Swiss-Prot record:
Keywords: Ribonucleoprotein, Ribosomal protein, RNA-binding, rRNA-binding. It holds the Pfam family Ribosomal_S5. The gene is rps5. Belongs to the universal ribosomal protein uS5 family. Part of the 30S ribosomal subunit. Contacts protein S4. GO terms for biological process: translation. Residues 50-113 form the S5 DRBM domain. The keyword Nucleotide-binding does not apply. It comes from Pyrobaculum islandicum (strain DSM 4184 / JCM 9189 / GEO3). The N-terminal domain interacts with the head of the 30S subunit; the C-terminal domain interacts with the body and contacts protein S4. The interaction surface between S4 and S5 is involved in control of translational fidelity. GO terms for cellular component: cytosolic small ribosomal subunit. With S4 and S12 plays an important role in translational accuracy. This is Small ribosomal subunit protein uS5. One of its GO terms (molecular function) is structural constituent of ribosome. HAMAP family: Ribosomal_uS5_A (MF_01307_A).
């Protein structure tokens, strides 16, 4: 992966300038003020320890005037394992470029995740699960996240486990509907469910 020299970064947005000037110091401030992240460097500065995992690499055909062209399609999840997660997709002729595009999009899609101890079987009050039952949908796939007591672990498919772990969720039950073999829709449905923990009005 290419490394960006943040000292050379010239912000193109007002939010970017505020971050580079040190007027916004935490990622929490961004979401508390309803800012929209349009530059991945903002995430690089405020969440330098962000982890990333490739969920899927596919070869896809693209029709052009010169005929069919092959491209790599990559799905990536990013997260700090402590309440922030993002999912992105990238397409390019080279795998490396597709990964970089996917990581960039995942950073721009970063969302806060509200965690809690929502299971009636557990009363530890620690942020190890989701605080309430929440759903997310993408394409034909619908995912329901159900609070689980401490020690249950992530009762979910492999793709969902990665996204949940990167978000900092340690215990949860899941229910799924639709074609979960479609990695992008499965990952995005989980992402949307996690996003809904933050934006859901209690």
């Amino acid at each position: 992966m290419s490394v960006v020299d943040l000292s050379l970064w010239e912000p193109r947005t007002e939010l970017g300038r505020l971050v580079k000037e040190g007027k916004i110091r935490t990622i929490d401030e961004i979401f508390a003020n309803n800012y929209i992240i349009k530059e991945p460097e903002i995430v690089d500065i405020l969440l330098p320890g962000l982890k990333q995992e490739i969920l899927n690499i596919n070869v896809v055909q693209r029709q052009t005037h010169a005929g069919e062209r092959s491209q790599f399609q990559v799905v990536v999840a990013v997260g700090n394992e402590d309440g922030y997660v993002g999912v992105g997709i990238g397409k390019a002729k080279q795998v490396r470029q597709a990964i970089e595009k996917a990581v960039r999009e995942a950073k721009l899609n970063l969302t806060p995740v509200r965690r809690g101890c929502g299971s009636w079987k557990c009363s530890c009050d620690e942020p190890h699960s989701v605080p309430f039952v929440v759903r997310g949908k993408s394409g034909s796939v619908e995912v329901t996240l159900i609070p689980a007591p401490k020690g249950v672990g992530l009762v979910a498919g492999d793709v969902a486990k990665v996204v949940l772990r990167l978000a900092g969720i340690k215990d949860v039950w899941t229910q799924t509907r639709g074609d979960t073999r479609t990695t992008l829709n499965f990952a995005m449905a989980v992402y949307n469910a996690l996003r809904n923990t933050y934006y859901f009005k209690i």
